[in-house]
Amino acid sequence: MSANPLRVLAIANQKGGVGKTTTAINLGTALAACGERVLLIDADPQGNCSTGLGIGRTQRRTTLYDVLMGEAPVVDAAVKTELPGLDVIPADADLSGVEIELGQTARRSYRLRDALEAIRANGPYTYVLIDCPPSLNVLTVNAMTAADAVFVPLQCEFFALEGLTQLMRTIERVRGSLNPRLEIQGVVLTMYDRRNSLSEQVAKDVRAHFGDKVYDAVIPRNVRVSEAPSFGKPVLLYDLKCAGSQAYLKLAREVISRERDRQAKAA
């Protein structure tokens, strides 16, 4: 059973190196493997999400830049990936010019939200995942303004919670002025090393702070997860049996289950 209506999630953390793009790629893949119809939006000018899904530069004729500039609808910008049910709107370096080009344009913060309206009611997708850049700029603001909720990957490292403070302030600002419905979807612990007592302590602190917003599924440090992007593949298509793949499948099932519960309560 697929989630319906569409759920738009901004995958964000304003601290770099937390596994944000890795989570976007592999959660999107795992959701599609579970039967969902997923659109990944690469909102980072570096284009790592696109590269990690095997979308070469020649396949990026239409990108998120074109969508935000009003030159292409979402459905025309979406590129099919190797996995049925998973499409991506790619990014390239042009995206870094959006902030200047939009300038003081009316509704500059609503560009992505307006573009997604066309697929909210009867589009082909059940989930949209937006891979946000780590910096707070017009791309991050557009992602959060378009999103129903923010999905937070959190690395099991010493300064993990410190990075969250800035993200929470950003969410509050967006909620106050642009998107009052924005909420925290959940927090997923990444790069977890059970041999390291620090990982255990960070996990304990995060669960104490966020309670049931923290997913039970934990993404371990896993060499196969690290290797997969260099082959242009999500880890599930690179090595399905590895611990990283199984963790992302567990996370996807948990996301779907929680979404069904949320919809049931809202009905």
From Swiss-Prot:
A Pfam family: AAA_31
InterPro entries for the chain: AAA_dom, DNA_Partitioning_ATPase, P-loop_NTPase
Binding site for ATP: Q14, K15, G16, G17, V18, G19, K20, T21
GO molecular function: ATP binding
Function: Involved in chromosome partition. Localize to both poles of the predivisional cell following completion of DNA replication.
Name of the protein in its database record: Chromosome partitioning protein ParA
PANTHER family to which the protein is assigned, alphabetical: P-LOOP CONTAINING NUCLEOSIDE TRIPHOSPHATE HYDROLASE, PARA FAMILY PROTEIN CT_582
Family per similarity comment: Belongs to the ParA family.
BP GO terms, sorted: chromosome segregation
Organism for this UniProt entry: Caulobacter vibrioides (strain NA1000 / CB15N)
Record key words, sorted: ATP-binding, Chromosome partition, Nucleotide-binding
